[in-house]
């Protein structure tokens, strides 16, 4: 899920944390208001389902955003890392979040999985900040992506990939 609430991307409403897995499975997650059935009815995949699929797609590298910047879900980092390791995908995953402390925790728990900061506002010395926190990716909002960020990140051997808002 992209948002804390299911309203925008599904035919349901309410906060994800208020819904059971069974209730989430009943929702159509095809952006009904935006795409009006263009892709048919889609069910929300679990992380496990996604990782199972990804394990078969050998050339795929993916970014998984931990959705814990508005509401923190204790233990999420460990559970996600355990599942990634279960499928042997450590070298094909980038874990990112707007909650930088969460990504630092991920990197402390498993240094083999790349980490990235999602950033919505201007950050001085972005490369130094990210490198100090031991992440490999810096994902700024395009509005705040400046030449100095790219230079700072390059000098600190970081990958810069702009944040895409859907």
Regions inferred by a protein language model and the residue ranges of each:
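Metal-dependent phosphodiesterase/phospholipase catalytic core, i.e.
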Residues: 2-120, 133-136, 140, 147, ...
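Catalytic cores of alpha/beta
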Residues: 166
């Amino acid at each position: 899920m992209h948002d804390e609430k299911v309203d925008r991307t599904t035919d349901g409403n309410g906060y994800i944390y208020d819904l059971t897995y069974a209730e989430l499975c009943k929702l159509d997650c095809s952006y009904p208001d935006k795409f009006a059935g263009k892709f048919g009815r889609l069910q929300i995949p679990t992380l496990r389902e996604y990782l199972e699929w990804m394990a078969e797609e050998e050339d795929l590298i993916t970014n998984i955003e931990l959705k814990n910047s508005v509401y923190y879900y204790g233990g999420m980092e460990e559970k996600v890392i355990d599942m990634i390791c279960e499928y042997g995908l450590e070298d094909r995953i980038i874990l990112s979040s707007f909650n930088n402390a969460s990504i630092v925790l991920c990197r402390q728990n498993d240094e083999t999985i790349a980490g990235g900061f999602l950033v919505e506002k201007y950050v001085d010395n972005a490369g130094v900040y990210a490198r100090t926190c031991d992440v490999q990716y810096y994902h700024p909002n395009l509005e705040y992506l400046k030449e100095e960020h790219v230079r700072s990140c390059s000098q600190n051997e970081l990958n810069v990939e702009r944040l895409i808002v859907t």
